[in-house]
Structures are given as C-alpha cells and as structure tokens.
Amino acid sequence: MVIGVYRKCFNVLVDSGTIVSVFVNTGYTMPMSIHTSLNEGGEPFFDCVFEGDDVWISGGVLTSGGFACIMSDALLQEMHRCAIPEADADILKKQQLLFASLLKKHGKRRGEGKNLERWIKFLFEEIVPPPSEKILCSLAYLFEAIRSGDEQTVIAGLERTVGAGIGLTPSADDVICGMCHALYMFGAGREFLSLLRSYVKAFGRGRTTLVSAQQLKLSAGGVMSDPVFRLMECIAQNAPEDTMRRTLCKAVEYGSSSGTELCMGVLAGCCLVSTEAARQTVCFAAGKESGNYDGQKEFCDKKQVLRLCPSDEACR
C-alpha cells in the first residue's frame, strides 16, 4: 500500500511492515529502494500515485492505480553490514583529516551542507556553532552527549535532533545515520546504537518521516548503502587521496543534500572513535554480524520485489 508520495519517489508499506521507496531513476542509493524506468523529465509521482493505492509487480511492470512503468532494476539497492573493530588508530586519524579536507572541497552546500565548514571547525577545533544554526547546534549537542556516555543526555540529544530538517530524510537524521555507520563499522558506540534503535522504535513515527525512521534503524544496525560502504572502506584501509576523492564524490551525489549530510555524520563518527575520550566512553565490542548484508534475500523473498497483493494470484 502507498503511504507517502513525493515528486521523485513514493513509499510502499509491505506485509512485513518494511517500507520500500520506489524512485525515479535519479541515482539515489538509499537502502530499501528500487528504481523505475522513468527519467528526470517524467511525470511527478504525486500526479499519478495516491495514498492508499495498492502496488504490485507482475512481468517486470510496476502498477499502482492507473499508473504503470517498466522496472529498470527489479532489485533493492545493494546494502552492506560490516565491522572492523581493530582498525589502526593512527591510520584512522590520518584518514579522517584527509576525509575532512576532501569533504570541505567537494560537499554540496545544501541542507546542513551549507554549514559544512562550521561542522568541521566544531569537530576539530571545538568551535561551537552559533545559536542561529539550530539544527547544527542540536547535532553538536548530540555529538557531545554520545562522547559523554550519559544515557539521559543522549536521549535529550535525540529529542532535539531526530526529525530536524525537511525532506524525505531530514538533514539531522542523515547526519545521525552517518555517525552510526562509522561507530558500527569501527566497533564503537554499541550502547548508543542500541539506544537509538529503541528510541526510534518508540518515538520515530511521531518525530520524523516513516522512511527516515527506517533508515535510522537500519543505520543503527550497521546497514549502509554501497557508496557509503565504499567510503568507509577507504577510511579504514588507508586508501590514497585520489581513491578517496572519487569515492567521496560518488557518496555526496546521493540525493539533494543527503549524501553530504551522511558524510558529515561519518566524519563525526570517526572523530568519536579516534579520540581518547571516545575510547573511554563510547567504544565497546563490535557488533557480532559482519560481511555483506543480503537485504535482497531478507526483504524480497528470493529477489522478487514488492509482493504486495496477496489476493492477486498474478503476484504470487
């Protein structure tokens, strides 16, 4: 059933309770998303798909109400889950400096990306953002709360940040997801990740979009899209500057501003992992699950996407 319609995507609630986003083929690489054959000039989804519509796929054609299109890729976007708890601390510090320099140069100045320089100064020089930048200040508060290790302070930080911003995935949520990617991959912040999952489960639907709530839960569980995973590999494996630049540029192209905001979060997560204070308060044993995350198998029943009409034998 359709539960949210935007210009370039609509959201579908499947029987398992999972949300899948169906996109115009514009290069989005969000976990739990698939692409249609439509292009940028295609008819906006909100002109032809409506809340509550049934959705199904049969013979490679996606249909909803009076709308139908051929699928360009009938699989979910590739997803990964990986932990590298023994990453070299010196390499991590060196790579995060390189990452910060490249992000400052190539990040998009949209959404919270407009405050990219201020965010980097906060992370590396402890210069607090001005009160006028409310979302950035809230993110800085959450960063310090995670570093403190105090549960109630972290909850207060989540209350200030989750859902802050506009769009399919609000800016603050994208930054939090990026933090989660770094913390999980480098075996840190297990208690924060667990707390975030519990918080989103209890309050997410009232504080942010349904899609963003799902992305927060996936990120807290270590699930990331392929471009972000490749970027994390560059940081962990001491990749040369040219390689990191190419990988970063692919990551920041995600969405209007989400790619840059995810990278801002990844940088913050790396800073939490690499500082001595963070090692005393937020680093715990790495997650047990590691390796490629077979989201297609888990959510798509042998890679058949969106089996959403159990009453229709054509969909079985």
Q: What spans do the regions from the language model cover?
A:
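Accessory, usually C-terminal, subdomains that scaffold auxiliary metal cofactors
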Residues: 184-185, 190-238, 244-254
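Cationic, low-complexity basic patches in intrinsically disordered or flexible, solvent-exposed regions
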Residues: 304
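Short helix-adjacent coil turns
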Residues: 146-152, 235-242
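Hydrophobic, aromatic-lined core segments that form the binding pocket/scaffold
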Residues: 110-123, 127-147, 155-215
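Phosphate/adenylate-binding glycine loop and adjacent helical scaffold
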Residues: 1-139, 172, 245
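Acidic, carboxylate-rich catalytic segments that either coordinate divalent cations
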Residues: 228, 240-294, 309, 316
